[in-house]
Design a protein with these regions (language model features):
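Bacterial signal peptide processing site
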Residues: 30-31
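Post-signal peptide N-terminal segment of mature Sec-exported envelope proteins
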Residues: 35-59
Length: 175
């Protein structure tokens, strides 16, 4: 009986060891972004997005646009994304969304203050785009549908909706 007992425990120990090895290998199976070169970057970016549930693809795509928009340089973006999984990137996206200043149109003071916060939070490369956009905006007037339609938007969302905004501004159409 001692022999069977010893053999039984060896099998259990072997199964436990195999389970531990498999569990340790699982994180390695998670798709991660590799930014070491452009080909690997785009290949792994697609793999990471495909590894997410289909319901998260749109959020991931929009979030990546946000990351690129607010990044100071490609090197900074690559450093931030390298080695991250889809879930980790979605977490970064949520943190960014929560931290980005949004336009407040509730009063003239709130509007002007939120514009200053937006500008201060932009990478230097986007400040001229911001200043150009400001030139297209009419003066603040409570109830102005153009301004009201932008309430709660980040600057990136405003830029994405720029064609819509310009279609409501005759001065911008004449440029």
């Amino acid at each position: 009986m001692n022999i069977m007992s010893h053999s039984f425990f060896k099998r259990i120990a072997a199964l436990l060891l195999l389970s531990a090895v498999l569990l340790a290998a699982l994180p390695g199976c998670t798709k991660r972004i590799d930014t070491t070169n452009e080909d690997k970057y785009y290949k792994t970016l697609t793999e990471v997005m495909d590894s997410l549930p289909a319901s998260k693809h749109r959020e991931f795509d929009a979030g990546m646009s946000m990351i690129w928009f607010y990044s100071e340089s490609d090197d900074a973006t690559n450093a931030m994304l390298n080695g991250k999984s889809g879930k980790e990137i979605l977490a970064v996206i949520e943190e960014m969304k929560a931290a980005l200043p949004k336009l407040d149109t509730s009063s003239k003071e709130a509007y002007e203050s939120s514009l200053e916060k937006m500008k201060a939070g932009l990478p230097k490369s986007k400040v001229s785009t911001f200043n150009d956009w400001l030139k297209e905006m009419p003066a603040y007037r409570k109830g102005n549908p153009k301004i009201e339609s932008l309430n709660g938007m980040t600057f990136q969302k405003i830029v994405e909706n720029r064609d819509f905004v310009n279609s409501q501004n005759p001065a911008a159409q004449q440029k």
